[in-house]
Amino acid sequence: FAAALYPGRVSREVVASHRESLAVSGADGTATFILGGQIQGEAPEIFLVYPEGNYIRSSKTRPFLQIGETKFGKFWLELVTLVRPDLGVGMKIALGSMLSTTRANLSVGPPFDLAIYRNESLVFDEHRIEADSAYLADIQHRFVKHLMGALDELPDVPWSDD
């Protein structure tokens, strides 16, 4: 947990040292961080470090942490807690979360940076999906197609004929 305290402390110190210039510009200079990793022989952990320096950890009931526009992609990420998928399906769910957020908020969009950590590997695989990626275009098309198809499978609303 000491590692999670460090970026919070440094962030507060930086904001304090630039308080005057931040006030002039109208910015607050605060930052929120997601910090994750594993010490060899211990379980991996993920922390959400707030601008004030305090933090929360992921848990079995909440295995994901979000920064930024947290309200838009939450449904998709909660699927991970219900389904407990393998890594491949989990990544698709994460991309679904990012795509739904881009649809709901104009200030969010690609590139999407994805970091994958496999337990005990002590290495992150980092990937970037650019806005002009053929893969991104394909999954956007497929998500819309399948979501629209799922609507056809839902029962009619009882009062829809009124």
Roles of regions detected by a PLM:
Residues 1-162:
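N-terminal nucleophile
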